[in-house]
Amino acid sequence: MKQYLDLMRHVRDTGTKKEDRTGTGTVSVFGYQMRFDLSEGFPLVTTKKCHLKSIIHELLWFLKGETNTQYLTDNGVRIWNEWATEEGDLGPVYGAQWRSWPTPDGGSLDQFALLVEQIKNKPDSRRHIISAWNPALLPDEGVSPQDNVRNGKMALPPCHTLFQFYVADNKLSCQLYQRSADIFLGVPFNIASYALLTMMVAQVTGLELGDFVHTFGDAHLYLNHLEQVETQLAREPLPLPTMKINPEVKDIFSFKFEDFELVDYQAHPHISAPISI
């Protein structure tokens, strides 16, 4: 995936050194965009092996509207554990905003169910948007993630903030706006997750595949990832794999892990790097 390596190289070569919330420090740029034609293959990074199981289970967890880590840990996915309470709670994070956005009358709005119906019935609408950015529920930076959850707020603010679908020539495209992007550890997950989500929505709405467009706000490399970045940039991308989805599934909320099969995934060895909390 040349697009991903180009992003990494661009930030390494032109970015500005900045302090950050974690105290690690970053090299950062503001504003960058990548585009992937989903008809050309599934955009899973090949210059290091990625853990697809975690990507799929996390996406299904979002779509379930869940905000407790139980489903994830039951399926061997621990990527959210550092921020959860002892009970596994994360507060009103992505799943809650996608499926249960709070309304002024004390009720909730299922953004995703409405989105799918709107794409089916009004494909040319410019309102195919889902937002996870709810200012009233953002965490207090001076409080631990766990205490924020106890206060009824998110453990972490959403990094992948807002996404929009677009229909043209019977093809479905998706654009993600990501306000904050950990390029080495997080972005490969984000690309694959939203590419897969686009494929799922296309299937249940009867559309063909268009593009996944990934737009960044603060795109950064952590300073303690720079050695790993050099290792990855020295590797040649391999051919993209193919993602097969069970064609029988017609309801966006009915997908299961077993409905996905990655075919012909060739990748260079995994590269370990510390996560900044």
Curated annotation (Swiss-Prot):
Catalytic activity of the protein: dUMP + (6R)-5,10-methylene-5,6,7,8-tetrahydrofolate = 7,8-dihydrofolate + dTMP
Top class in the EC scheme: transferase
InterPro entries named in the record: Thymidate_synth/dCMP_Mease, Thymidate_synth/dCMP_Mease_dom, Thymidate_synth/dCMP_Mease_sf, Thymidylate_synthase
Assembly and binders: Homodimer.
Pathway(s) this gene product operates in, as recorded in its UniProt entry: Pyrimidine metabolism; dTTP biosynthesis
Annotated active site: C159 (nucleophile)
Residue sites binding (6R)-5,10-methylene-5,6,7,8-tetrahydrofolate per the record: H51, D182, S276
Domain of life where this protein originates: Bacteria
Binding site for dUMP: R21, R126, R127, R179, S180, A181, D182, N190, H220, L221, Y222
Membership in a protein family: Belongs to the thymidylate synthase family. Bacterial-type ThyA subfamily.
One Pfam family this sequence matches: Thymidylat_synt
SUPFAM superfamilies, sorted: Thymidylate synthase/dCMP hydroxymethylase
An example Gene Ontology molecular-function term: thymidylate synthase activity
Keywords associated with the record: Cytoplasm, Methyltransferase, Nucleotide biosynthesis, Transferase
Localisation: Cytoplasm
Protein task: Catalyzes the reductive methylation of 2'-deoxyuridine-5'-monophosphate (dUMP) to 2'-deoxythymidine-5'-monophosphate (dTMP) while utilizing 5,10-methylenetetrahydrofolate (mTHF) as the methyl donor and reductant in the reaction, yielding dihydrofolate (DHF) as a by-product. This enzymatic reaction provides an intracellular de novo source of dTMP, an essential precursor for DNA biosynthesis.
EC numbers: 2.1.1.45
Chief location of this protein within or outside the cell: cytoplasm
GO cellular component, one term: cytosol
Taxonomic placement: Bacteria, Pseudomonadati, Pseudomonadota, Gammaproteobacteria, Cellvibrionales
Record-given protein name: Thymidylate synthase
GO BP, one annotated term: methylation
